[in-house]
Amino acid sequence: NLIDLTAREQRRNRKHPQLRELADFYFDMFSEDRRFFVDEWKCDLLSAFRELRSSGRLQIIASAATHGLLPILQQQTLQAARAQVLVGRDVYVELFGEEPNGFWLPECAYVPGLETLLQEANVRWFVLDAHGLLFGKPRPCRSIYAPCYTPSGPAAFARDRDSSRQVWSAHEGYPGDPAYREFYRDVGFDLSMQHLGPVARGTRKFSGVKYHRITGRGNEKQLYDRAAAKNAAAKHATHFLEQRWQQIREISEFGFDPIIVAPFDAELFGHWWFEGPVFLEEFIRRTANERKFSLTTPSEYLAAHPTEQIIEPAASTWGENGHLAVWLDQSNAWVYSHLQMAVQRMSAAARTHAQSCSAITDRVLKQLARELLLAQASDWAFLMKAHTAREYATKRMMDHLARFTRLHDQFVANAIDEEFLRDCEWRDNIFPNLSWRYYV
């Protein structure tokens, strides 16, 4: 559909050279994306990631099963957080055939005690926001520029604020450059519904075809110049490299080998910041030629520096103001009593049937766990707070809880509606090999 739309755009803009050039660019980009995804990788991107991982070019780590906010879940019951961690670990093992070294804490959300669950999952390291390490007990001797081991074992690395600000901030950082593509100006809102055709499907929405650059903070936007945008990305990559080298040089004067950890949401690169992948490629290529410092991973750093300080990190997130307010305020706090009731019921059912169960009981308990895990996704609370899709987020979470409750009530009454169970299994079929015994 997008290829067809850009072909129509090529014809529509044939007398407008700059717009025609942009239409050609999008036609070529979407055509190449389709060739790569369909022809080269047979619609199986996991195989591509497996190849990159096995060749040593990419380290992939695990995360919680459905991006549940672990500090809140752990406060409800230990089993709630434990299942998120261990199911996430199990999925990683199924996909890659080995246990993960690292673990991404959703929203970098940490509370003391979580590391015991990570240790149970055999995780060697995780990432905190800077204040999680800085306010640890005792204070870290090397600030945020070296990891610290937690009392239970796994090492905690801290996010570097300087590099995060330079890349993440749309106002202070690179993505706000006037040459870069404007995210919010899209032909999905500019062109007629008839011309958009199947891309629109009857409603206005982002199509991914955008002809304008950021230009400035006003509403007037100039046409996008791809060459100028790529040049800006290359300059920013050079600047980022120079800033990191200056940082490393200054820190190294204190007599240790520092690591700068720069984690970002993947959606920044290519989605919000269209030129982000160009920036990454330029930075990686330039760094590959450096002799003064190099790219590394937390696993490689720990292997080279096995002796580090032991501290208890502080409760922290990378959300607004560094705590849980985004996911726990008057707009969304009501969800947690529902989630707590559900996990208590899940744990009771799991304990009752932990030793032995029939095939139908196993199916029901797996589906109850799926619905609970899906209801626990932190995205729902985030969207309620952000007001961007509050109704959708509320409906999604309540639908999962409604299916959980209906199925649980049938289970307790020994009156399973197998047609309803099959419908639930068809709707929510994530984690086919899920172990519900983690709730015991």
Question: Where are these predicted regions, by residue range?
Answer:
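CE4/NodB-like, metal-dependent polysaccharide N-deacetylase domain
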Residues: 78-105, 243-263
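Structural preference for beta-strand elements that scaffold enzyme active sites
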Residues: 57-62, 102, 124-125, 154-156, ...
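Conserved short loop/turn motifs at secondary-structure junctions
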Residues: 99-110, 265-269, 389
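N-terminal catalytic cores of secreted or lumenal carbohydrate-active enzymes
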Residues: 1-64
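Hydrophobic, small-residue-rich alpha-helical packing segments that form membrane-like cores
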Residues: 109, 114-123, 139
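Active-site and substrate-binding clefts of carbohydrate-active enzymes
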Residues: 1-21, 138-440
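His/Asp/Glu-enriched short active-site or ligand-binding loop at hydrolase and phosphoryl-transfer sites
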Residues: 124-136, 295-297
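Short, solvent-exposed turn/loop segments enriched in Gly/Ser/Thr/Pro and often Arg
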Residues: 64-66, 102-111, 131, 298-303
